[in-house]
Amino acid sequence: TWADKDSFMNTITSSVLAGDDTYQLIAGYNAYITTLVTQDCLYNLYDTAIDFTKDWWYAGYNDNVSLFGKLYFALGDASLTMWENCEVLFFNKNLMENYGLTSPYTLVDTDKWDFDTLRAYANEVSADVNNDSAWDETDTWGMVMYNKRDFPVYFENPFCQKDESGKPYISLFSERLADVYEKVYQFYQVEHGCHQFQPDMNQQIFSEDRALFYQAPLRYAAL
C-alpha cells in the first residue's frame, strides 16, 4: 500500500526489524528503495531459486544494479512503469513533411540516424518567430526536452561502472564524455536547436507544431 514515501519506507523497515515476515516482495521507486540495502532490509535474490537468465528478466538493468555479486532489486516484464517511464524521442510528422526532411524511421532502417543528423534537423527548424532574440516558449524549436542529464546515456557513456569485484565506481570523467558534452552544449546553448521547458509547456509546444522533436517518457504518448 502507498500513502507517502516516508510511511511506505517506515512500514518496510519496521516489518523487517520486527522479524514478522509480512512482506516477501516489494515494488518501489529506484530513487529511495535502494536505501534499504544499507539498512540490511533486503535479501540477495541470487540466493533464491529465481532464474534471472530467462527472457522476461532485463539482464542489462539487473547486471548493472548488482553489488559485489549480489542482487537486491530486479526488473522484468512485470515492471510496467519501466516502459511508461522509458525516455523516447517523438517527432512531429507535419514539420518533417513541411521541411522536406527524411523520416527518422527511414534513416534508422538504413543505419543513417545519429546525433549529428538530429542536430542538423533541429537547427533547420528552430526559429525566433517574433525576432525578439529571447528564444522562449513563443518560438519554434527543433527539439524540446526536460531532462538534459539523459544525453550521456544516449551516447553509451555510463555514469557508473563496476570493477572485477563488483564494486561500482564513477566513470564520468573521460575524453569521450567531454566530447559528448561539448556537442550537447553547442546544440543547447549556442545553436538554439534545443531547449528545456517544464513538461506541460513541452507538451503544448509539440502539440502546436512548434517543435520537431520532443524527448519525454513513453507514457506521454497517451496525452
Short names for language-model regions:
Residues V37-D40, Y61-T106, V144-G166:
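Periplasmic solute-binding protein
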Residues W2-T11, D111-T117, C194-S207:
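Short helix-initiation/N-cap motifs at beta->coil->alpha
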Residues R176-V190, N202-Y220:
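Glycine-rich, aromatic-lined ligand/substrate-binding cores of catalytic
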Residues L17, V37-C41, G100-L101, A120-N130, ...:
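Sec-exported extracytoplasmic/periplasmic mature domains
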Residues I33-V37, L218-L223:
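A ligand-binding cleft/hinge motif common to bilobed small-molecule-binding domains
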Residues W2-Y61, S66, N98, L212-F213:
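Extracytoplasmic "Venus flytrap"/periplasmic binding protein-like
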Residues R119-A122, F151, N157-Q198:
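Glycine-centered hinge/linker elements that transmit conformational signals in sensory
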Residues D128-D139:
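Acidic, glycine-anchored loop motifs typical of Ca2+
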